[in-house]
Amino acid sequence: MTGAIVVAETGTGRLIYASRPLASWTPPRLFAALAEVGPACLLDSAQVHPRTGRYSILVSNPTAILSGKGQDLTWRYPHDGVERPVVGNPFRLLRDHLRRRRATAVPGLPPFQCGVVGLLGYELVRQLERLPATTVDDAGVPDLFLLSCDRCVVVDHLAGRVWAMARPAPLRQEAGGDGEARAWVAAVMERLAAGPRPTVERPFYITAPVTPHWNRTTYLTVVARVQRYIQAGDVFQVNLAQRFTAPVADGDDPWGLYLRLRAINPAPFAGFLRGDDFAVVSSSPERLVRVQGRVVESRPIAGTFRRPASAADLAATAAALRADPKERAEHLMLVDLIRNDLGRVCLYGTIAVDELLATEVYSHVVHLVSNVRGRLHPKQDVVDCLRACFPGGTITGVPKVRCMEILDELEPFYRGPYTGGLAYFSDTGAMDVNILIRSITVRAGRAFLHAGGGIVADSHPEREYHETLHKAAALVEALGEVSAATPGVVAVRNACHYD
């Protein structure tokens, strides 16, 4: 029954939930209406698709937050005002917390039924591999920022429904009381029934043009160094990224930036994370790994052509991308890497490529995409699966560890959130993690964005340089016009300065 509150036993407690038709609500409207003050996250299927973009998830008002750098971490409990420093491997701490939260799945509900949502930064790889510490961390964003939430709102886009779910606090469950959780679900249903209200978003401006760290000449020089490593036999392919920055107007709200990026470049693994003093804005097209039941899936993207200006040329461009020998070879090499990663945690003989060399179209580019799946080994869990796949081979290269050593040498700055992931870990054991490409991080008055591409032996450096600019184009367009307070620069498409 629409809006009726249901109480379900889940083994270790109860889940209280209700649902109603989605109607005219969208994930951004839900976030604007329901997200509470403070840290919050929206995982947004801005491009709906049965396989990749079915669910959107909103969490705020977390019961606990795990954040920090390296192994110097902190558990914070906002409801109690308590902070507890901890020293340890973040993957182990995450596993321990997920085990404490574990609950039986309620049939018929979306896979996320409360749990942990948030950021896994690229630098977490230093907890998995010994890498040289030569890059500079000038952005200061945590390596991880995870919200543990007993309340969530989930959209099932294919079913056209929105769900509110809540777990009573453990002590209240023991006493048989779940009034607060029930009241919250009822309040959400009442707010949804009233429908969206007009909102006025705060502006978001940059105050000077976006500038790449490397000019064209430097980028071509670095590509040549990568190709020398390839010729020496160190690696087969390296995914080299360059960073762009822009100053941000004081007090501007990154939520406005997210809305612009979503409109320009809708993507199935989009997301917005509001941290303590930073924000991550993403329109990612790529899934790192998903676990649902015992089925594991990864969806690598490798191979990019610029989207043609004319829709009439789109089919020809996609066909040319699929037929391009270099793009095909690079893609198949990375599919093999993903098969190997999944093979570390999946049952022998279950790894299969069930979609190969498909094309996906986005606002500025066309991508080659495949889908790899397997069955998780009974002795492995979602954290084992994450460790096996993280970070994605499509954004490091082949072989992965040597590529990361080379990237640490050649890229001058921490990647931070870029090429890490936004993730959910459901109390039911489900997990889904994107790869944070097409993303912007905002902190301390600056916006940081990256764009990269795979370098192989026969890469044309000039073409690779322009590919990074094409990939950055949607992000630069979303950053938009320079503030009117800065005279002389007004056009969106002139908001990036290239040397």
Where do the PLM segments sit?
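Extended alpha-helical targeting/anchoring segments
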Residues: 1-499
